[in-house]
């Protein structure tokens, strides 16, 4: 499958307990990367949701779009047409994770009942009311929810940090530049279900270990 970057590319679990925050009594938001890393959560990609041409490796911490159909079994939670994959872990409380990428990527969170069979409205990250997505595609950078877009700045690095405070309804994306975090977009809303981190990958993406 040859990818044409200028063409329209279709965009691309068992419930696990989210990592509890270090101290639920805290009400202030983290300020430094070291503060955010206190809420680091170890995530793994769910092979049962991965699009059939996404290859998972490194203990299901890396996803790469390939030209080959992978040997995944049929599964009702698999994305049928989009280059997407969800994590195994459903998150609540305060959580932080980082993603390093090459090529085009969308870094999302979604409810478990996000659609899986088909293309956009019910399945694509950010095109419905069940998912929120930072889209860093080749010629288009935006945040998307319910198919509404907000432009975001060009990231200065290939690593993005995501901070979730589920109870407070806060979702914030950061560009990670060494020890500095540069805000890219912030959401304040009300989350009603566990949130599953997800990736749409036209290139490669890795869930990072804390450093």
Explain the meaning of each model-derived region:
Residues 1-211:
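Beta-rich ligand-recognition domains in immune and ubiquitin systems
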């Amino acid at each position: 499958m040859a990818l044409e970057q200028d063409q329209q590319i279709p965009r691309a679990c068992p419930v696990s307990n989210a990592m509890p925050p270090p101290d639920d009594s805290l009400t202030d938001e983290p300020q430094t990367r070291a503060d955010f890393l206190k809420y680091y959560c170890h995530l793994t990609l769910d092979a049962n949701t991965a699009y059939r041409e996404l290859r998972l490796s490194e203990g299901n911490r890396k996803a790469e779009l390939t030209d080959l159909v992978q040997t995944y079994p049929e599964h009702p939670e698999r994305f049928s047409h989009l280059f997407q994959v969800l994590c195994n872990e459903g998150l609540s409380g305060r959580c932080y994770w980082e993603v390093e990428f090459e090529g085009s990527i969308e870094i999302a969170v979604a409810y478990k009942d996000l659609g899986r069979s088909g293309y956009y409205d019910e399945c694509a990250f950010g095109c419905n009311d069940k998912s929120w997505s930072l889209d860093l595609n080749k010629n288009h950078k935006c945040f998307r929810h319910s198919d509404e877009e907000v432009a975001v700045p060009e990231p200065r690095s290939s690593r993005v940090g995501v901070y979730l405070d589920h109870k407070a309804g806060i979702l914030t994306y950061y560009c990670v530049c060494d020890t500095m975090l540069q805000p890219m977009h912030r959401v304040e809303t009300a989350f009603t279900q566990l949130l599953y981190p997800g990736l749409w990958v036209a290139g490669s993406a890795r869930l990072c270990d804390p450093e």
